[in-house]
Structures are given as C-alpha cells and as structure tokens.
Amino acid sequence: MKSPKIQFEHPTQLAASTFLRAVSENDASAMWEKLSRETRGLLEGLYAARSAVALQHAAGVEPNGLDARLDEVVAPLRLSVVAALGGPDRVGGFGVSGARLVDRATAYVLLLPDFGEERIVTEGDWRPSHLLAFVYESREWLIDLGRTAELSSDAELPNPLGVTR
C-alpha cells in the first residue's frame, strides 16, 4: 500500500475541529452537517429501528434545527464519540494533524491529545491516537463512519466514533 500524501492546510482539519466542537457542545445541527450521506443514512436507519418507525419516515432529517428528530438521530453517535475519546472533558482537548490524502475522494486526520506546549512529538507521544476519515462528496469533505472504522482498523488505532448502537 502506498503511503498517503500529507497536506498541512486542508479543509478536513477545520471540519474535524468543527465536528469535535459540536460534539463537545452537543450541537446536533453542526454535527449533522459534517457527516457524509452514507453516515447520515446509517444514523437515520438506526433511529428508525429504535423508534419502530418506517424508514421512509426517519429519512430526510434536516440540519436546520427545526427537525425534532435531529437530536435523537445524532445522540448515539455523540455518546459513542464522547465515550471513545475519554469523556466529555477530554473531547475538546484534541488537536488535529495535517491531512493524509488516501486518494482523490478519501482523506483522514489524526486526533492528537493535548501535549502542553507546542513542540515536535514522536509517535510514542501521540499513540494511541484516533483517526477521523473523510469522503469528498458534493464538493466538500464529510466525516464517514465506515471509512473511519476501516482506516482506524488498518492503522491499528481505536475508532474515535466508537461503537454506535
């Protein structure tokens, strides 16, 4: 496997920071806007199963804050992220690495724990870290649950999205 190209200024870095802030602040709308279509569909399906409603009634959740289902749909993901990153107090303590470009439609960033003062760190300083994967769709980089799990496993890193149930 070819090593991914590193890019130090990439839209995924801001997207990852925005997503982590949204998780920390329990901002369901901001979280939803950063998720890929596939991830949104998975969460809508999970919501439909939990709520015992037909899938067509669970689909099409709007991120505008007016959709009453939004909080319930993203709650399992938020709980998983908070648990995987070590609790609500630790979620805001992660930095974001430069982006690694796997291919034209896939990139990831590492979520790095707080090191204190700024410095060059070794792999031993940041492992185990977490990897957050993005797919490029509709002209933006969006977090993808499946790619995050797959790439985290390949890198032998814990999945920051946890086990969403």
Say what each PLM segment does.
Residues T12-L14, S24, D89-G92, R104, ...:
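Short, surface-exposed loop/turn motifs at beta-strand boundaries within globular domains
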Residues V102-R165:
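Low-complexity, intrinsically disordered terminal/linker segments enriched in charged
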Residues E9-H10, S36, P63-D67, R139:
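Short, structured coil/loop segments at alpha-helix boundaries
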